[in-house]
Every structure is written in structure tokens, then in C-alpha cells.
Amino acid sequence: MVGVPGAAAFQLGCEKRVPAMPGSPVEVKIQSRSSPPIMPPLPPINPGGPRPVSFTPTALSNGINHSPPTLNGAPSPPQRFSNGPASSTSSALTNQQLPATCGARQLSKLKRFLTTLQQFGNDISPEIGEKVRTLVLALVNSTVTIEEFHCKLQEATNFPLRPFVIPFLKANLPLLQRELLHCARAAKQTPSQYLAQHEHLLLNTSIASPADSSELLMEVHGNGKRPSPERRDENNFERDTVPPEPPAKRVCTISPAPRHSPALTVPLMNPGGQFHPTPPPLQHYTLEDIATSHLYREPNKMLEHREVRERHHNLSLNGGYQDELVDHRLTEREWADEWKHLDHALNCIMEMVEKTRRSMAVLRRCQESDREELNYWKRRFNENTELRKTGTELVSRQHSPGSTDSLSNDSQREFTSRPATGYVPVEFWKKTEEAVNKVKIQAMSEVQKAVAEAEQKAFEVIATERARMEQTIADVKRQAAEDAFLVINEQEESTENCWNCGRKASETCSGCNIARYCGSFCQHKDWERHHRLCGQSLHGHSPHSQSRPLLPGGRGSARSADCSVPSPALDKTSATTSRSSTPASVTAIDANGL
């Protein structure tokens, strides 16, 4: 779908047959037939009134071809006449070389379009309706561009607009902005102030919408068909103010002027020799087919038409005056997206081709390896079958009578006639296997012998280390026993020390009058070991007194009877060595030590 609303364009094409103003392009084209073009005098510039619009390629963007006629390669200047001072919308539009009905209809369509957008937003929700109203006011005030308005409107309503919306706004929004500027100047206000005070003139909800909102929005779930005409019949009061308009895609056939492409800037001639006015450009990708449909029946006329079009197209390009046409082709961003998609598709195709080529190469290599393996096994099978055949033949010849003489000759002839390549006798294989087995057996025996020798050496090392450790432990035990004897002797000699802690004693055990302590705490703590000795010392016959002479140094024989009771220091040393709660006897320590 190409985005200029076709209804307005077709109405313009139908109504431009009747000249609406003296300076319309239709009169210029008709008058130029009888007289050469004459430069009209420019109207006086009124400082207080609106400034006449200068025709530049970007002055009009409403999609209507207002270029002056080109006769004999000389473009005539644009007409700048007006009927009078601009006192209304139609009179203000005369400075733009537009008929009054054309400008009023375009403005009415634009206002109804904006009103329909706001009503659609209000139908969704009041918040979205307020957003749409703000966007519409910002668009009319030129604070946002048409593209930004398009994007923000789609984001607010979450509905895609039809493709003709942007070209329609580009074509008709300048007319509305000029009208707003004229009214604001008349009221001595800025356009934004005037629009804020007279918002109802732009978004007039009392005027019915020209069409359903589905004509402005893309069908999300539908099949893309236009709404039925019964929905238009509901708005019958619309026909009282605005004439009915044909659908956007229906071709108008009322005008006698033939259709042609927008690139054709020269007016065509009818059979009577009169010029027809240039119709406004519609959907330009189909108008050229409509324009030249009657020429395809006559090839000569078609060639002449093509030559005239190319010649005048070049003249219009080089003549310095060319109107800007509404371009309905893709924008640069859309072209970039299309190229990006195309590049991505080509890359995917290249990747698929590369993967297919690799897969075919892998399959080819696998097929070659399979073929080689199959040939190898075929050769092996043939060799085995030949060996079996020769073996059976030899056995049959040996058992058959009269074959002993020729057996050696036949076998020799057979072995000599057999090719040397690829043939190995069975005896050779047997000898080779036997040699390999012998080598394996010898290697295993050597390995076992080496392992046995290593184990023997390890056992010897372990035995020597064990003997050394036992000797060391015995030496340590002996040294500990000797140290214990020395400590015992020292404790016996020093009777002034405490038997519990070794400090200077101040008290004596009342039971035996032998044990000495530094205090009652040490006596109570040592009582678990001393009470046995204390009881034995009371009887006066202790077995330890007989074993005293066995102590090294012979000190026990020279001591008195009351000192024959063993010292508790011996119990301490035995307790530290054996970790037991009862003290050991001196004879037990002597026996262990010696």
C-alpha cells in the first residue's frame, strides 16, 4: 500500500477541470496554447498581510503537481496571483496556487484524521487519549517531527498505522500549520497560544469521523479487507458538509485527461490538439501503467510517448525548476533493513553451502576408506581361498597313486609360478609366531627375576631397619631405667624434700614418720600412693628392705633401718613411665632394668 490518501487525490483530479481562480495552473495551460507566456506583474508586497509563498522544490509537499507548464523547452514562471487579501482559510491558500475547495477539503480531511486518532485513543483508555491529544498538539506546533509522532503514537496505542499516514501528514500538515499561523497572526498571538485557546477548532469531536479507525490502523487479526459500505451509511450527516469521496484504491475515470507518470512533466495532447491539465500524481507505481495502457495497442505511439517523456524529463532536470514529488518509496532506514535482511539471508545460504560441501567431503572420504577396507578384505579372502585350494590339491595328490613322482615337481612349479608380492608361506608365519612367543617368555622370566630380586632387597632393608629400631628402643629403655635409679638414689639421700612436689619439706607423715611434705595439700595428694608404704613401714618387715643391696653403688647396706623404706620419688618415676595410679616396687624396676 502506498501512502497518499487516494480519495483526495482523485477528487482533485476530477475538479481541476473547472478553473477556480484566474491564476490556476489550468488557465495557464489553456492560455499558453493561443499566446506565448507573458510574465505577469508581481502583486505589491503588503507588510501587514501574509507573505506570498515562494515556489521552491520544498515549498509544497502535499503530493500535488503544481509545476508550471513547459512549452518548447522553456518553462514559464509560476503564477503568484490571488483574488484578494487573505481573510479566511480558502483565501490564505490562494497564495499557494491551490483551489479553495481543494485546500478546504485537505484541511478538513487532516482535522478529521487527527480527531479520529484522539477518539480512538479515548476508546482505549482516557490516559492513552490524553497522550494522543498531547502528541497531536505537539505535531501541529512542530515540536515533534512526523516520524517521531508516528513512532510515539504506535507506542502509545500499541497499534500499527497504515503506510499512507506519514505521506498524508507530510502532504497536508503544512497547510494546517499555515492556517494556524495566519489565525495566530490575526489574533496577535503565537501559534502555540492560539492552538491552546482554540483547541476545539482542531480536535472537534462534534464532527463525525470520515471513516472508521480501522482505515487508519493496520488490521491485526483481519484479512486486510476494507470495511463494508454499511458502516459509511451510518454517518449520513457527514454528506451534508463534505461531498462523498471514492475509495483510496479506486481509479477515477471522469477526467478526460489520460493518466501518466509523475515523471512526465509535459502535458499530453488529445486528438483535437488541445492540452489537458496535468493531473495530480496518485499511486505512481500504477499510474504509468494506466497512462500507457492505450498506447500498447499501437507500438509507434508508445515509442513516441517514451521519447517525449525522456526528453522532457531531461529538460526538467536541467532547466533548474522541478517540483518535489511525494516519494512513496522505501526510506533509508527501510532500505538498510532490507539490505541487512538480504545480507543475513545470503550469509545463511553461504553457511549452508559450506556445511553441505564439508559434509560431502566427509562422506567422500568415508566412502573411499570403506572401499579400501573392502578391497583389502577381498584380497585376504581370495588369498585364503587359494591357500585352501592348494592344500587340498596337495593332500589329494599325496594320497593318489602315481603322484609321488610329480608331487615335488608340481609343488616346486607352483611355488615358483606364484608371484612374490602379497604371498607369505604358512611355515614362515608359524616360525615368526614361535620366535615372538619365545621372546615374550624370556622377557617375562627376566621381569619376574628382577621383581624377586627387588623384593629380596626390600626385605633385607626392612629387616636391618627393624633390628636397628629394636636396638635403639632397648638402649632408650636401659637409659631410662638408669636415669630412674639415679633419681631414686637422689630422693633417698635428700629426705628434706617434699615427696610430692620436691620442694623443701616442713611436715612429716604421722603414720610412719618417714615421708615428708611441704604441706597438707601435698600429703593428701600423695596419700593414694603413700598409704600402702605407710602401712608396710608400720609392720617393720618390708620386702623392699631386702632388695636394697641390689641397687647400684651398694648404698642400701650402709643405711639405717628407718631409712630402709623406699622413697616416694621412685613411685613418681614409675608412674611417669608406666602411667599407672599405683606405685611400682624397686625390685620390679631393677628386674626390668637389668
UniProtKB/Swiss-Prot annotation:
Residues 442-482 form a coiled coil. Zn(2+) 1 binds at residues 498, 501, 518, 522. Residues 573-588 have a biased composition (Low complexity). There is a cross-link at residues 29, 440 (Glycyl lysine isopeptide (Lys-Gly) (interchain with G-Cter in SUMO2)). Zn(2+) 2 binds at residues 509, 512, 530, 534. Residues 426-475 are annotated as: Nervy homology region 3 (NHR3). Residues 98-206 are annotated as: Interaction with PRDM14. Residues 322-368 are annotated as: Nervy homology region 2 (NHR2). One of its GO terms (molecular function) is transcription corepressor activity. Pfam families: NHR2, TAFH, zf-MYND. One of its GO terms (biological process) is negative regulation of transcription by RNA polymerase II. InterPro entries: CBFA2T1/2/3, MTGR1, NHR2, TAFH/NHR1_dom_sf, TAFH_NHR1, Znf_MYND. Changing residue 363 to R: Reduces PRDM14 and OCT14 occupancy on target sites, no effect on interaction with PRDM14, predicted to impair homooligomerization. Loss of Mtgr1 impairs the maturation of secretory cells in the small intestine. Nervy homology region 2 (NHR2) mediates homo- and possibly heterotypic oligomerization by forming a four-helix bundle tetrameric structure. Belongs to the CBFA2T family. Homooligomer. Homotetramerization is mediated by the NHR2 domain. Interacts with CBFA2T3/MTG16. Can interact with RUNX1T1/CBFA2T1. Heterotetramerization between members of the CBFA2T family is proposed. Interacts with RBP, GFI1, TCF4, PRDM14. Interacts with TAL1 and CBFA2T3/MTG16; the heteromer with CBFA2T3/MTG16 may function in repression of TAL1. PANTHER family: MTG8 ETO EIGHT TWENTY ONE PROTEIN, PROTEIN CBFA2T2. This is Protein CBFA2T2. It comes from Mus musculus (Mouse). The gene is Cbfa2t2.
